[in-house]
Amino acid sequence: MNQSRSFVTGRGRDLSRTPSALSSNSETPGSMSSPSEGKTNAWVNSAYVSNFPALGQSQGLPSHKCSALALRSSQTTYIINFPRQHWNIMTFPNQSEAILATVASYAKDLDGKNSFAVFDTLKMPWSCRLGEKSCSGIDTLGHLADVHMHVLDPAEAEGKNLSDSETVYVYVTPPNLTDVKPTTIVLTECAANAKSANDLRQYIVTQLRKMPSLPFGCTTYAPGFLSDGVCKEHPNLFTSEELGAKIKVLTKLLIRCATSMSQDGSNAFCPKHPKVKIVHESNATSYILFNRPNGMVATNLILSDLPDDDCPTCWILKLAISEARYYALDGHHRCRSRIITPSVFRYLASIVIRVSMDSVLAPSDASSTDHAALVNMMCGIIQNTPAMRHVGISTGSEKVNNRSMRVIIMQENADRATQMSALYHLFLDYFGALNGWGFYFCSLTSLYGEFHGFSVGFSGEITHVNVASVIAKNWDTQSGIDNILEFKTITIPVHNEDIVCMVERTLAESFEVVINEHFNGASTIKVRRNGGDSRFNFTISNPRDAFLLLQKAVVDGGILQKILCRAMLKAIASLALRADREVQDVSFSFVLKMSLNPVNKSDPKSSELAHAAQMNSLPEFLASTPFTMQLGTLRDALLKKTGNVTVINMARTTEEVSNDALQEILKSIGGNSMTLDDPAEPLSDIESIPDPPPRSWASEDEAVNSPQTYSSRRKARKARAASKLSK
């Protein structure tokens, strides 16, 4: 971009202003890292500094200020947006007991369904080399070094529950690698920990429950991942890119969880059960051998203790070591476990709420989402991550639609693909924290129209979350907008963005008209589209009184019925509804967010306003359950309406018109007028039709090549040339 040079060198601008004044209110690298005098920032390319030698000399500016000005004028500003299809008006808290229990059950079920390494019962065929001694009974326990059990071939195990009838083989001593099956479990401490057959069985079961689970289909050259089964089981919840990726988002999160570290530098552990932590030992006594194309690979990841049956974090750690069985901790990206573990939890919780809870939240588990809080958190994470500064990413604020907004700033002298990749992995690590405010997808749009999307692999269907009943709760927000009206609209069976926009627009217009009629002058509401996104904002007089009246209107139901009727009557007349006949139903829910002014409890008030005085002075939001309208029924009724149909009576039938047209055509080509019923006249004597004379090709060639023909052609050419000269 050459915008920077024109900005500095002229176009009528006053260069006597200081660089700090020219830098607007964006957060330049200098404001974050505070470079000393004479030093430039880490990502400032020397080429940018050399492009402005006269600026520093003429103004007597220090070199770092000159560099900051060059940096400011060679950057791209991006606004953070949240598209309607991937945004929901409701979310859930981390500490919901119902969701915690459901996620724990789901994670445990995933481990069991995708694993053949944990068993309730074990059948151990003894293979002893004890001479004349019996191979059964207590006598064999002293020779456990000779006991070996091989893991069955996963191809044979797929679709079977090995804990019921199959035999499992496990080595208790390191085997000869030439005899190893594709996957082998090694337990070298069986002899030291087994006093009896029951002890031996219990020890093996315990060790297997702490070791990585092996997904069905895991073969020598095709290692299976946990996320493969999840995506295949619920393909509608993931985007096509997610289904086609080699390593899916869930796998990435679990691998990062397995390789993460706690605040003190140790491996990840469960905060509720500190004994359950990930152990990585190079000389582990219990491990799994994988016969990979490049040789034998041993996984040394294991849990230090049994996972608690009802703890989702314990089972997340178990899933993590299973997914990361091929990965070593050394040299791998290691993020904080307190950051990545909640990300895995909320990723699984999003799936669980959809498939196990039918996308319905209990009233106590419903929380509001918030654009402003999410943008502020994203910018704060970028600011507090030194790696972002190293690749030329910072944050700032810009005036957009007369409103100050937090923005992301990227320097032009850094590789844009590297910058976007760094942002993607940062947002992925912090998915848990961001998803708490509603994040599933965001887009960065520059002021010049450049667009970049950041997805965590979920389709828009994952955001179809509703509350079980109409609720009013505190609205946690960091928004500068006092009042917001949001809709979550779904078209069934296919998504149609035009119909969604049309329905939400008509609902907002109807909301304004009907509510003003209901208030009857007690309060006035004005709704308008929120600049830059799909929400609506509104102004209202007497917000606290109005909120109470709105609550009463929702309880009565009549106001909502009027809003719905008025909106749908306008919607069914639109071109968008008629153009797409695939959409049969539309479902929508709404949330009304209002900032309520605190009231003085000492003031005399009516009973309703006395109740308002007891309400929390925090902002409130009012959320509804889904409303469903049968658009197909409305469309059919509109098409059948007699007022839209005009019956035209023709003076002649279509058969008569066709016959008359045929007669006219026959006359025009010289044929006799006839009817379709007239019989064809047979020929009396077929020999009476003379044959055409034979064609003489030689005579034609002679005529073409005769001297007379050439002479006439020459005369014609001479005549044309003479006429051109005369002109």
Swiss-Prot record:
Highest taxon of source: Viruses
Biased composition, class Basic residues, residue ranges: 712-727
Biased composition annotated in UniProt, kind: Polar residues: 17-38
UniProt-annotated stretches for the region Disordered: 1-38, 671-727
Protein name per Swiss-Prot or TrEMBL: Non-structural protein 4
